[in-house]
Each structure stands twice: as structure tokens, then as C-alpha cells.
Amino acid sequence: MTKQEKIVSMFNDIAPTYDRANRVLSMGVDTIWRKKACNLAFSYCGDEALSIVDVACGTGDMMGYWKRIGDENSILIDEIIGVDPSDGMVGVGREKFPQMSFYIAPATVLPRENSSADIISISYGIRNVMERQEALIEFNRVLKTGGLVVILEFMKNENPSSLGKVRDWYMNNVLPRIGGLISNNYEAYRYLPDSIEGFLTVGKMEKELEEAGFEMLYSKSFSMDISTLMIARKK
């Protein structure tokens, strides 16, 4: 089994408890980050009806926020589709959002035509894509010229502030234990801090986006640098 296959299998295992663990472990703050991402992305869009693809959609949380924030701001949305390689996560998503379309596929092979989407989002998922550069090139293929890629992620912090050190302590010592208790899978929540430590810094992620044909519009970290929002436009 490849590393990517192991990650997908892990998410299949924790799918039934994933949403509850997320809310508890983030203390609900992740909802603020998701709303911020949607609102800011919409501010860069024009008046035409939007096609949105949420990659690594999991149980569909971000898809729900795109719909809700869009409705609140009278944004015209033609479609919102979710793509994820975990059938366990997608199964939960289909129960939560039966009116939305989900596809089981990796980030590197999106079931969409060239230049067909206005927004591609990936929330806390790009870190789990082993073939990351290939995925970014695939995002570029599917997006229209001027389309947006919206990334929310836990990034590696090479020079953490005092608050950042508190974040790291929480991630390494508290999160795996609580997540393990909720999901009965300690290993899955031990993976999170380990994967962050092995991931990119903000600067390196920005460089990869630019190398894949995007220009950065926005990049900022929130809540003790726990979460980073990046928005880039296809050239």
C-alpha cells in the first residue's frame, strides 16, 4: 500500500466521527476560517454564475459554506461539486448534502473539462496530496483563465512566535489524545501534527502555486498562525 493509499484508508476509518472531532479539536474556530475564505474569494469574482469544485471535500463542510455564504451575499452559483478519494468521507457528505454532487477521485485527476471551473477550493487537504505539484497543474487545467484556487491549510512554521509554540504544543500533545478518544483511532490524529511538520512553509507553498501558473492574490495566517488562507488566480 502506498503512502497515499494509507492516508485514504485512514480517512475511511475516521469518517463517521470526523465532523464531531473537527468541531471539538478546533473549538469551532475552523468555521470562522471557512467563512473568511468564502467571503474573500467571492469578493474577487464577477457577476456571472459560478462553478465551484471543492477538492478533498471530505464530508462536504466547505461545500456547505460555499452555498450558505453565496446565498447570504446573493452570489449566483451554477454548481458546487465535491471531489475526494475517500469513499467513507464522501458517503457521509452525500448524507449531509443529498442535493450536491460528489465524485470519488484524487486531486490529480479531477472529473471536469478543461477551463470549466471558476473556483477550486481545497481545505486542509493539499497537505495530504502526495503528488502535490501534479494536483496544482490539474487545478490550473480545470480552472478558467482568471479562476481562483482557494487553499486553507495548516502550514509548517519554521520560526514560531510564542503563540506559535503554544499552537505546536497543542497540536503535538493535546490534539492526538482528544482526536483519538473521539475516533478511537489515535494514529490518525497523531498523523496531523506529523504531517504539518513535514509540510511546506507558506513561502514554499506560494512558490509552488506560482510555478504551476498562478499569481498570488492573498496569503495570511490566522489564530496564532494555526491556519493559513491562500488565494491565487490562474494567469
Go through each PLM region and give its residues.
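N-terminal, positively charged/glycine-rich alpha-helical extensions of SAM-dependent methyltransferases
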Residues: M1-D19, M171
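Conserved alpha-helix/loop element of class I SAM-dependent methyltransferases that forms part
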Residues: G28-A49, Y65, I69
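C-terminal alpha-helical "lid/dimerization" subdomain adjacent to the S-adenosyl-L-methionine
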Residues: E5-K6, L152-E208, A212, Y218
